[in-house]
Amino acid sequence: MVQKQYRFAPKSIFTFVFLCFVAIVVIISTSSLVQVEESLDPIEVSDEIKKHDRKVVIFPSNFQSANNKLADFLTEAFGQRLNKGDIVYKNRDTYELPQTVYTWNTIDLFQSIGEKDNLKCEKIPLNFEISKIYNKNADLYKILRDFKNENSFYYKEVSVFFPDLGKQLRERTIEKHWFQLIGSSVWLEQYGVHLMISRVIYTKTGNKVQPVISLSYVQAFDRNWTELKNVTLVVPDSGKAKFKTVSYPSFIPIPVYHNVNQQRGKFYGVEDPRIMLVKNKEGYEEPLIVYNSFNRSPPNANYLEEIKNLVKLDTYRSIFMAWIWRTQLGKSNVGSSLPDLATTDDHKYVKVKELSLPNKKRPKTEKNWTPFVIYEDQKKQGYDSHLYFIYSFQDLSILKCSLWDAGNCIWEYRMNNKKTKISELRGGTELMNVNQLLDKYNFAGLETVKDQFKGKEVWISFARAALSKCGCGSKMYRPNFTVLVKQGGRFQLSFVSSYMDFGVPILPWAKGKGLCNGKNLLIPNGISNWVLAKDEGGGFQDYMTLSLSRSDSTVDIIHMKGILKSILSEYLLQTNRDVLNNNAIHCALLESESYCKSYAENYRAHLKRWQN
């Protein structure tokens, strides 16, 4: 084999020395990129990022490569250039229990006993501990300025709905027209970060009930809930045995139907996104969001006339699923195959799928489906093949929808076959599977606890009751704790709580107005994580983080502990297979109405004392 020889002949010894110095600096700088994780523990890495706002690239903890090869892989596989000070590491962060102060909290649960004509609302106390509320709203001025400066294809597509953004940035009037709300997050164990999605809405008038468009904003937080301002995750590229990168924070391009010429009575974009983890066929967990959005009727009309505003096509508010680490070309599956949007066919959007009721029924508006997975299915198959939804809490109705295949959803369970009536109790968070949580741990004494769940699956969630004109404002929303049990092929909404507020300070709907002017809202959005840990007495304790929003203008979290221990009694886990009624809901709503009236009375009394 002939070896090529390269001769280096510098014009001067000074040039030679200088070039050697530069080469040494480059080598040292590049080496430092991947040595950070070897020399610092995860907390110190996080502290370095916070101090210097550096770019950080995180590989999953199971990535098959040595630490000192990560930077090379990043450059060779993705062509990404690294700068001096950038941090590249393979995750070894574990979940950090919240370091906070807790106070006791009690709510009342109701179960399904008696008949509707002879309603018995027996209260069962549920005791647990709560922290104060923590706000996680982003700097809207900064993120919108960055979005505008990026000038991506997605920004160009949606910015026609907010042409005054530049003026609003210059005049510092962003807070009058833009709001961030409905944050929902998951803990990515392989990456050691909390991944949160929220809505950023624009309203031309400044009125939150008259939004023009809703954008989806994704952020990553470290295990201590400090935002990572410039983070890239190396994630699997599904089905290709390869990897790709995703960077946060960012507005993600979820494909939606919209028409700038038809805005009257329309609210475009992604509404109420809820994020959760599903286990895919490749065997790893990936984030999935469920949301609702306008969708146009099947393409059977004159598109050109629609653009010219000569015809008005039927639109529907449909439920969608979106795989935020997967992509699709174009947006034809959301009813946007219009001539003026032809260029979108070449753009990569987040992969989405519309969900349809059995028999292709298509109501005008679909909202508030409550998602969950059946853990027994996952154990048998090795992955989640379907996502299930509580379609209606009253007259309990549950849908089964394929995660990976086409086709309509089917009814998995219906309390009765009558037309489902949507009650005041509606979807809030996803349902968290208690069996799945317990199976992750093998603490001493936990087997006795697991025995209580043999032959049944149990889920908990925080729904929300929407009460109109109950005494305080036009509408009041608060969380309602629920327990769902599946046993012998039958589902039962075993327990529902009255309104609960966690002692959180409520914000007025409009600045300068009273708490009972307009809407009075505290909405549960998602269960961010739920873990077990050993306690000092040799037993265990459970810790949960819940995301909330107040007055449709905040992204908040609150920590709780002891919920699982409180429901771990034979009494609370029993199901009466002969009882099929809505009594738990009826009792919870009656008590919630009493809460609303008492809240209004106390607020007015407080105002009177303050005025005097």
UniProtKB/Swiss-Prot annotation:
The chain crosses the membrane at residues 13-33. InterPro entries: BMT1 (IPR021988). Pfam families: BMT. It is found in: Membrane. Keywords: Cell wall biogenesis/degradation, Glycoprotein, Glycosyltransferase, Membrane, Signal-anchor, Transferase, Transmembrane, Transmembrane helix. Glycans are attached at N224, N230, N480. Belongs to the BMT family. This is Beta-mannosyltransferase 5. It comes from Candida albicans (strain SC5314 / ATCC MYA-2876).
